[in-house]
């Protein structure tokens, strides 16, 4: 029965998206340990705790931090995770891995939630604190890699300032099609379906000195971004990926600041030059995309499920 259900699900995905899930049967053997010194290929340390306090990890001992930070006010994570938290709390190893309370902690959660008195400044301060702690733990020239997307340029500037303030530099971005095309809150909308993996490298105070921004530097970054966009669109449309205008703008923002490095923070005059040029580029992003097909509203299983309820026409 399990196999037949799995095959049926795979066929549904194949019919709708012309793709199929592949299961290789590999298993993961892992026995959690409590002491960081005992970590090896089969013995991880599992913790459920505040990422601003990683005292159990020795400084400059980690090659790379891979994470997925909360997206501002997009999702109330702690409230949603309680469904799973209560089961983890009942686990035989609950106390060992940090599930010491029956529901998830919410007081210190890094999120934008006006009801809880948490504004955007609180969110940015929290993200910066986490990135700063990561900077302490990664080795010299180590990496911080995380996924991010946001329609707001202000949100991008906030996350970039957190990156730089913590002692990292954005080196590269990798667009990745999201696991699901849409959710209940983004169906039938001009939403973002492309995640961006931002690769940031640890820098020292003496390395990578800031350069005075000139119009030529900004134009070169724009040109690099344009070439990257065209190349990315070509790759994604070969597999029939959907692109909305916000998708393309997000890729452009990430690649632009990757090309620019830390320079845009050098002074307010330079910052104004950078942002004004970037905004013009973003406003004309459909012209940059040219003949590539741009999706006006996201399709997906939620859209199909609620099509009749919402009286959505094809």
Question: Whereabouts are the PLM-identified features?
Answer:
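Segments forming glycine/polar-rich beta-alpha architectures that bind adenosine-containing cofactors
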Residues: 41-66, 71, 287-314
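SAM-dependent methyltransferase catalytic-core segment centered on the flexible catalytic loop
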Residues: 46, 51-55, 60-140
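Flexible, glycine/threonine-enriched loop-and-boundary segments that flank and lead into catalytic domains
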Residues: 14-66, 123-125, 129-130, 143-149, ...
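Single conserved hydrophobic/aromatic residue that forms the stacking wall/gate
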Residues: 1-15
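Hydrophobic alpha-helix feature that most strongly marks membrane-spanning transmembrane helices
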Residues: 70-71, 85-92, 132-139, 143, ...
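Flexible, glycine-/basic-rich loop-and-beta segments that form/coincide
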Residues: 183-184, 188-236
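Long, compositionally biased intrinsically disordered regions
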Residues: 223-314
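A structural signal for short secondary-structure junctions
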Residues: 38-41, 137-140, 188-193
């Amino acid at each position: 029965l399990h196999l037949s259900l799995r095959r049926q699900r795979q066929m549904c995905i194949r019919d709708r998206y012309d793709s199929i899930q592949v299961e290789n049967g590999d298993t993961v053997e892992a026995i959690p340990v409590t002491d960081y010194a005992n970590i090896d290929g089969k013995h991880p340390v599992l913790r459920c705790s505040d990422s601003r306090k990683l005292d159990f990890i020795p400084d400059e001992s980690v090659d790379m931090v891979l994470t997925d930070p909360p997206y501002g006010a997009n999702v109330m994570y702690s409230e949603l995770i309680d469904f799973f938290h209560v089961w983890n709390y009942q686990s035989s190893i609950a106390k060992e891995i940090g599930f010491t309370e029956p529901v998830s902690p919410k007081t210190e959660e890094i999120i934008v939630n006006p009801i809880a008195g948490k504004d955007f400044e609180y969110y940015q301060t929290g993200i910066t604190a986490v990135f700063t702690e990561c900077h302490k733990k990664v080795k010299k020239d180590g990496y911080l890699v995380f996924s991010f997307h946001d329609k707001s340029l202000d949100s991008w500037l906030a996350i970039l300032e957190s990156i730089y303030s913590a002692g990292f530099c954005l080196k590269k971005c990798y667009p990745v099609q999201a696991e699901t095309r849409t959710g209940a809150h983004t169906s039938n909308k001009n939403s973002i379906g492309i995640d961006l993996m931002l690769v940031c490298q640890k820098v020292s105070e003496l390395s990578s000195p800031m350069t005075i921004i000139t119009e030529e530097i900004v134009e070169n970054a724009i040109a690099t971004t344009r070439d990257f966009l065209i190349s990315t669109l070509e790759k994604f449309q070969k597999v029939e990926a959907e692109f909305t205008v916000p998708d393309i703008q997000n890729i452009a923002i990430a690649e632009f600041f990757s090309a620019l490095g830390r320079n845009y923070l050098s002074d307010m005059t330079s910052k104004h030059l950078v942002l004004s040029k970037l905004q013009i580029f973003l406003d004309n992003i459909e012209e940059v995309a040219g003949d590539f097909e741009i999706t006006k509203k996201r399709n997906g299983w939620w859209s199909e499920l609620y099509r009749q309820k919402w009286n959505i026409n094809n």
